[in-house]
Amino acid sequence: MPRNSGAGYGCPHGDPSMLDSRETPQESRQDMIVRTTQEKLKTSSLTDRQPLSKESLNHALELSVPEKVNNAQWDAPEEALWTTRADGRVRLRIDPSCPQLPYTVHRMFYEALDKYGDLIALGFKRQDKWEHISYSQYYLLARRAAKGFLKLGLKQAHSVAILGFNSPEWFFSAVGTVFAGGIVTGIYTTSSPEACQYIAYDCCANVIMVDTQKQLEKILKIWKQLPHLKAVVIYKEPPPNKMANVYTMEEFMELGNEVPEEALDAIIDTQQPNQCCVLVYTSGTTGNPKGVMLSQDNITWTARYGSQAGDIRPAEVQQEVVVSYLPLSHIAAQIYDLWTGIQWGAQVCFAEPDALKGSLVNTLREVEPTSHMGVPRVWEKIMERIQEVAAQSGFIRRKMLLWAMSVTLEQNLTCPGSDLKPFTTRLADYLVLAKVRQALGFAKCQKNFYGAAPMMAETQHFFLGLNIRLYAGYGLSETSGPHFMSSPYNYRLYSSGKLVPGCRVKLVNQDAEGIGEICLWGRTIFMGYLNMEDKTCEAIDEEGWLHTGDAGRLDADGFLYITGRLKELIITAGGENVPPVPIEEAVKMELPIISNAMLIGDQRKFLSMLLTLKCTLDPDTSDQTDNLTEQAMEFCQRVGSRATTVSEIIEKKDEAVYQAIEEGIRRVNMNAAARPYHIQKWAILERDFSISGGELGPTMKLKRLTVLEKYKGIIDSFYQEQKM
């Protein structure tokens, strides 16, 4: 895809000055929105139809950065480090390690507009063709959306909830919400009506944006239970029929014409960096989800310094190109795709809604990103797909790939920081690996990130064998995303990187190996949980440190290694402390047929394990089918089984497969630190874990409490049979 295509969002010639007042028959709704926005601003401020340069844009909007921002002054009388009120303010954590003065989201965008106004900001597909929005157009659309929200009655510190897949509308609605003094609140598209109701009620949503009729139906079911909700806007599909207070995107954007630019500017001028602008709801694995309040300083600081720690570059040096596909309701995707994009003038291209069902690689090939982020499960799926293709390839091709990956992995493990590559490694890359990366869409990708969950060593080794280094980040919703980051200049295998500027860490209650609870401090730390004072006080101690509940250690160079979750730590009936993740990963490494493994044993006499097998996905629903993957069938054939489905293995209790799994677990037990770490019983489940099944969260993280409850009968049977 061209890097600097002139085709803008609603701007067929790439120049906003070319927009004509006549609506052509081919004009789309997006074209009309941009055109009418331009006309409205021009007629109010310009006497002639001059090109919309940076200077004329300033004149047209009659904008200036407020004096208090120009003078680097801001009002911060608050002393408390936390609040639970949406309209509350906090004392920002400015100290000698991060003395830079704070600024607002609007200032961040305004400065980006000055530098990157003519660059492509957003890319999206319409009728199988890529179209683009420049930063100037993006800013205008965000202002238009802000005025639309004000017209609909958005109150200060109330929310606009967005329920839809990643899109330009998601972006400029989010930015417009902040401009209008509201709070952006993402809702996962997989959420039930009840989950939507809880979040929309808790955040006092005045407006809810939905992308499809399916999502609209959820809101219509719960509208009567939402006293603050004034309107719903559907932006990808038309509503099934005309309904009161339900607007199409065109109608919503048209409402903005009735609000003067000066009214919006007055609101922008009053905004402070220590006010809430984003709400991120946790997945709620233990009760109702918590609303994580993030300030404007949280967002602008992390977008700038968190991304710098990952070597994300400003467009003056190299315009970063990224693909947006992970749920924007999650802070990792939102900070990486949306806010960091604005900070550095990146080009963000939107994947199709079925990205995780198989179309992501097609988008990657077309876009050719310069940096890419995926949760571990996404990288695992890419790995499994490559393995399946390799298994179906001819003998020579398969052997060439194995050879190339073997010599490359060895080089990357023995000399991880060296730019001097042996001839065999360079030859392997030229003949084989470069072609694989190109087929994946990673030919120009310099930085590949992962986070939100631990990654298996097998997956990291696999991609190192392809000459794709995966850079880890560590953080939480409560740290606005990354608090630690890896990069080409700060990398150590298996670590989560080093501290982001303006951040601090301490480990409490360390054991003999230096492992303790990770506690964090810095400009990334959240304001508090909305309406939850008790939970906020549990998370933030009297000195202002955030207690993460994660266990880890630091090496001599400051690299962080996560060892597990304190709450996930299994304490057996005999008093042994057993971290489950290393044992689960060891089982998956030993048995390539295993998709998910969950260790059980808290307050039990011995350890047991639930296993799921690798199976294919339904292309329409993305749910797991009964059919084994190519890799799983290859495992079966290798151990002497002809099984092609999970049900065959379970119903017939396939002796070859069960024996192979038993032997694999025996090998894991042999490498265990002590007998209490041995897995004594296990069972294969009929279906793999999934988001729709409830066992996985939106970022594919295992929801252990849900699994314990859902499979309680099987788990209890492990221990009922152990009679004294």
Swiss-Prot record:
Location(s) in or outside the cell: Cytoplasm; Cytoplasmic vesicle; Microsome; Endoplasmic reticulum
Residues holding ATP: 282-290, 472-477, 550, 565, 701
PTM-bearing positions, type Phosphotyrosine: Y658
Function (record text): Catalyzes the conversion of fatty acids such as long-chain and very long-chain fatty acids to their active form acyl-CoAs for both synthesis of cellular lipids, and degradation via beta-oxidation. Can activate diverse saturated, monosaturated and polyunsaturated fatty acids.
UniProt GO MF annotations: ATP binding; long-chain fatty acid-CoA ligase activity; very long-chain fatty acid-CoA ligase activity
Organism of origin: Homo sapiens (Human)
Family matches, as Pfam families: AMP-binding, AMP-binding_C_3
GO biological process, one term: long-chain fatty acid metabolic process
Protein name per the record: Long-chain-fatty-acid--CoA ligase ACSBG1
Composition bias, Basic and acidic residues: 20-30
Annotated family: Belongs to the ATP-dependent AMP-binding enzyme family. Bubblegum subfamily.
InterPro entries in the cross-refs: AMP-binding_CS, AMP-dep_synth/lig_dom, ANL_N_sf
Top-rank taxon, per record: Eukaryota
Enzyme class: ligase
E.C. no: 6.2.1.3
